[in-house]
Amino acid sequence: YTQDPELYRVLSDTAKDMIAAAEEDGRISSYTRETEFDGWDMWARKYVMLGLLYFVEICHEEELAAKALYTAKREADTILAAVGEGEGKKEITKTARMWAGVASSSVLEPIMCIYHLTGEKKYLDFASYIVRSGGSSVQNIFEDAYRDELPLCRYKVLKAYEIISCFEGLLEYYRATGIEKWRVSAINLGRRIR
């Protein structure tokens, strides 16, 4: 953060606009209710949450920071209500028809950030579900990186930015759980990228 007051004002105004954009149930999406949880909806919601959460880190105003976190939590809660395990919920890797769900699975990072800030177990539980889901409907990218047997060009999903984004979330998951396997998985992937 540069400490530039004009930049802070722009970020603050943007955070306020995002907070105001939330629907009554907390949803912030460019997709209609009929088409949500498809296409790039989850990817866009990820960045709604990350934008708000990154702003919380630099916010000078306690009340605004609390509202930004609350808004990010409510957005996450709309996802938790519709996506996951259980009757009537959509599998995370099925919330997009492209790239086998890796873009959707990358919500792991903001979900973990919310968990780190709140300590609310439901977010860690949802993150555990994402990790168990493997990040993709055609390959468990986390397990494959842990086993370290495949070169990246042999992965079934070759969407580099989204895969890296999933692993950023996996590292946050490791930070919360201490499960060494996931740290090793991320290190293996990083080594393969070099």
Model-derived features with residue positions:
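Glycan-recognition and catalytic cores of secretory/periplasmic carbohydrate-active enzymes
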Residues: Y1-R194
